[in-house]
């Protein structure tokens, strides 16, 4: 059993736990992999990436594409004011954001994946990819604007929006799927993962299921 040590008033699991912990036991170092008929390139893949995180994201894209013809992928990053041992703030943020959007778009299908990371800073930060039914919102910016406002109200911190935060993936369009997958792969990088209490998750994802009658596999 790996031990733990105290550093800057926070508890961190040792590297042994990071490598073999529940969310880090499928670390790959391949620069690409096959998903259905698609070859997905992983930028800096040789540095390590988490297979379960990557496949959770791709599975959610596919699941939504089995019930709608196209989805927006929207990237969003956020910091918190101080370290916390759990991800409770993310749960509150997610609930409030979805509630806010569904007031205007009641039937909106809203998928997501988020990851928790911590490197040299004293507190963790988060990366998000929202996977949203593009048939039921007028634009991706509507979702991003709502996310920014929700996060600011919750934390009083302005989030970071990466360059080119929007992607659109169309059912049956292999190239759009590959491009979005390669962008989302940033969330799956192993660096920064694992620095958290054992019971706390490194990532979370929505749980949409594939509609069997309309399999979207490319």
At which residue positions do the language-model features occur?
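Catalytic "initiation/cleavage/transfer" segments centered on a nucleophilic residue
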Residues: 18-68, 134-218
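Residues that flank catalytic or metal-binding motifs in active/ligand-binding sites
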Residues: 72, 124, 183
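Histidine-centered divalent-metal-coordination microenvironment in nucleic-acid enzymes
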Residues: 112-135
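Signature for HUH/AEP ssDNA processing cores
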Residues: 59-119
